[in-house]
């Protein structure tokens, strides 16, 4: 257990660390711009007859930049209403969620993204705030690298050792 590579083997609900993904989809689809605003319901939003979302503060009107800065669950849930389930699912797959990465290491988890046929009316809203899916740390790092690299996925490399100029191992 102590030798387990948790970066690739443990899948978890990413929560707020995932919110940049629906933001990227919204910008990609041009459904919103960073200066557009969303009303965040003063901190409590009824998604369906028995499901409420809350923010940690009672926000009213927030720009997309502020929704990201303040990590507004309500803002992201409403943002997700601007795209359909299939677009979100395809975007998640594009970023590598729900599949193993390119590395060849044992015990890598693919995480879990349910097929859209198994989504509820509120799944898209919950996925946008990092719930109802599971991912690995490597998958999240790869997704962030796609954003940092202008939409291009750079294949990760596994480093076996590092040598100094005298070809002595400095890391193994």
What are these regions (language model features)?
Residues 1-16, 21-172:
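Beta-lactam-recognizing serine transpeptidase/beta-lactamase-like catalytic domain environment
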């Amino acid at each position: 257990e102590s030798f387990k590579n948790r970066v690739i083997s443990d899948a978890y609900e990413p929560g707020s660390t995932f919110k940049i993904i629906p933001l990227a989809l919204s910008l990609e689809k041009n459904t919103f711009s960073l200066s557009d605003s969303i009303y965040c319901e003063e901190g409590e939003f009824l998604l369906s007859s028995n499901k409420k979302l809350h923010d940690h503060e009672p926000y009213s009107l927030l720009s997309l930049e502020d929704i990201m800065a303040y990590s507004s669950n309500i803002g992201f849930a409403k943002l997700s209403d601007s795209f359909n389930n299939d677009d979100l699912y395809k975007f998640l797959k594009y970023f590598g969620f729900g599949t193993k990465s390119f590395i060849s290491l044992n015990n890598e988890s693919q995480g879990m993204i349910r097929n859209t046929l198994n989504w509820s009316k509120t799944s898209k809203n919950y996925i946008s705030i990092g719930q109802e899916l599971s991912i690995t740390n490597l998958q999240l790092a790869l997704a962030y690298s796609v954003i940092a690299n202008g939409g291009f996925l750079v294949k990760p490399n596994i480093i076996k050792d590092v040598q100094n100029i005298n070809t002595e191992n400095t890391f193994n």
